């Protein structure tokens, strides 16, 4: 599996690491992914999902079902 959020699709960002002498080198800024077991109320079951912490925060605010529908994700595949 790739290092991407299964709900939002967030993945690594290409950036630059800049030293004190201003030498720039390429660097990957990875997404903060967490494996979580969340209760899906509509499906009446637990779903194991690899999601970003930003998505987890949004789920706590609006709920798993509403957040998944707004991102066009079918929770039946988890």
UniProtKB/Swiss-Prot annotation:
Keywords of this entry: Ribonucleoprotein, Ribosomal protein
Name of this chain's protein: Large ribosomal subunit protein bL28
An MF annotation (GO) of this entry: structural constituent of ribosome
Gene Ontology biological process terms in this record: translation
Organism per entry: Prochlorococcus marinus (strain AS9601)
Record lineage: Bacteria, Bacillati, Cyanobacteriota, Cyanophyceae, Synechococcales
One Gene Ontology cellular component annotation held by this UniProt entry: ribosome
InterPro entries named in the record: Ribosomal_bL28 (IPR026569), Ribosomal_bL28/bL31-like_sf (IPR034704), Ribosomal_bL28_bact-type (IPR001383), Ribosomal_bL28_sf (IPR037147)
Family named by the database record: Belongs to the bacterial ribosomal protein bL28 family.
One Pfam family matching this protein: Ribosomal_L28
